[in-house]
């Protein structure tokens, strides 16, 4: 029993029914906000499950086409492709990524033909999947990543991906000057309409672990000389501003859940859309907890994605994109 006139403010009034909660919801989660990362492997004739990411697979070309159409039909906003070449096709400079007949470029052409303007087709513009050393760039004589040689290679990758039908290229290697160089290279090659998704703040994270299996990466060492330190928020803001100055069309924060402060900061300063990537480790943690019946998988997924949206992400990359689209329909 309450004292007359107290409490005057009762926020619970706006939580009283599902209809009321929907009406006053401040954050929405819709399939159109989501991008589905997909892996396509060369030299396989059936799906290859990724053990550390239950439910995620390396696709064949044919299975990729079917899964992509299904995701788009479900309402997923975009698709982001990663190519996985055969081990014997990897080399020091990632030639398979530039080759028009390389698995990623062939798969881009497949999906561009199948889907046309029904989706936004994105490509990972990086070398780690294609190099025999597993780094995101070209190495110099001392085994260090050569920034400028790598950027030149990224331009070749981006042009090859644009030629193959990518609407958006995503340089994810965190090289200095990569966005400006790609913009110049794409424009010079006649692809002024191809957008650049800049991985503006990509942190050196332990949560990328399962992804290395997903792309069959052979990395030795780490990527701390080019990916950002997890504790450096002001450095992230500097990187964001540099990429915006160089012409980024969309900026990416990666990973998402551990860096929601950076997502919020980016959303506060960016005149272009902000994306955030719910990475493989985030996915694997929820899967593992759900498999042990410690959490409700669907509820946890929707809560995590809503949190990323609440922080300010316009676009969320998630391996649950197709599932969520079905759940929300």
UniProtKB/Swiss-Prot annotation:
Positions with a binding annotation for 5-aminolevulinate 1: 212, 223
Query: Which UniProt keywords are present, listed alphabetically?
Result: Heme biosynthesis, Lyase, Magnesium, Metal-binding, Porphyrin biosynthesis
What does this gene product do? Answer: Catalyzes an early step in the biosynthesis of tetrapyrroles. Binds two molecules of 5-aminolevulinate per subunit, each at a distinct site, and catalyzes their condensation to form porphobilinogen.
To which species is this protein native? Mycobacterium leprae (strain TN)
Per UniProt, where does Mg(2+) bind?
A: 239
Provide the Gene Ontology terms for cellular component.
cytosol
EC number(s) on file? 4.2.1.24
Biological-process GO terms, alphabetical: protoporphyrinogen IX biosynthetic process
Task: Quote the record's binding site residues for 5-aminolevulinate 2.
Answer: 280, 319
Mind telling me which InterPro entries this protein's record contains? ALAD (IPR001731), ALAD_AS (IPR030656), Aldolase_TIM (IPR013785)
Q: How does it assemble?
A: Homooctamer.
**Protein family:** Belongs to the ALAD family.
- Name of this chain's protein: Delta-aminolevulinic acid dehydratase
PROSITE patterns to which the protein is assigned, alphabetical: D_ALA_DEHYDRATASE
Q: List the disulfide bonds.
A: none
Please give the SUPFAM superfamilies that the UniProt record associates with this protein. Answer: Aldolase
Q: Write down the chemical reaction(s) this protein catalyses.
A: 2 5-aminolevulinate = porphobilinogen + 2 H2O + H(+)
Pathway noted in the entry? Porphyrin-containing compound metabolism; protoporphyrin-IX biosynthesis; coproporphyrinogen-III from 5-aminolevulinate: step 1/4
**Which domain of life does the UniProt lineage start with?**
Bacteria
């Amino acid at each position: 029993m309450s004292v007359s006139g107290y409490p005057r403010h009762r926020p619970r009034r706006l939580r009283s029914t599902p209809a009321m909660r929907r009406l006053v919801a401040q954050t929405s989660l819709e399939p159109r906000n989501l991008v589905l990362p997909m892996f396509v492997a060369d030299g396989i004739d059936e799906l290859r499950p990724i053990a550390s990411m239950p439910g995620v697979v390396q696709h064949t070309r044919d299975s990729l086409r079917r899964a992509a159409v299904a995701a788009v039909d479900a309402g997923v906003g975009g698709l982001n492709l990663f190519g996985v070449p055969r081990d014997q096709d990897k080399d020091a400079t990632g030639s398979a990524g530039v080759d028009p007949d390389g698995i990623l470029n062939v798969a881009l052409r497949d999906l561009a033909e199948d889907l046309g303007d029904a989706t936004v087709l994105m490509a990972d513009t990086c070398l780690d999947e294609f190099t025999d050393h597993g780094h995101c760039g070209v190495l110099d004589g001392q085994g260090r990543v050569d920034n400028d040689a790598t950027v030149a290679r990224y331009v070749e990758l981006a042009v090859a991906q644009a030629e193959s039908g990518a609407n958006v290229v995503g340089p994810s290697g965190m090289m200095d000057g990569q966005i400006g160089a790609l913009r110049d290279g794409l424009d010079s090659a006649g692809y002024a309409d191809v957008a650049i998704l800049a991985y503006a703040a990509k942190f050196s994270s332990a949560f990328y672990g399962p992804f290395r299996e997903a792309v069959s990466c052979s990395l030795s060492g780490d990527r701390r000389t080019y990916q950002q330190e997890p504790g450096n928020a002001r450095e992230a803001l500097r990187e964001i501003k540099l990429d915006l100055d160089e012409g980024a069309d969309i900026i990416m924060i990666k990973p998402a859940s551990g860096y929601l402060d950076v997502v919020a900061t980016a959303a506060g300063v960016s005149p272009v859309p902000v994306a955030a990537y719910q990475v493989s480790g985030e996915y694997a943690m929820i899967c593992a907890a759900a498999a042990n019946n410690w959490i409700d998988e669907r509820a946890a997924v929707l809560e995590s994605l809503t949190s990323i949206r609440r922080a300010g992400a316009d676009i969320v990359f998630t391996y649950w994109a197709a599932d969520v689209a079905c759940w929300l329909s």
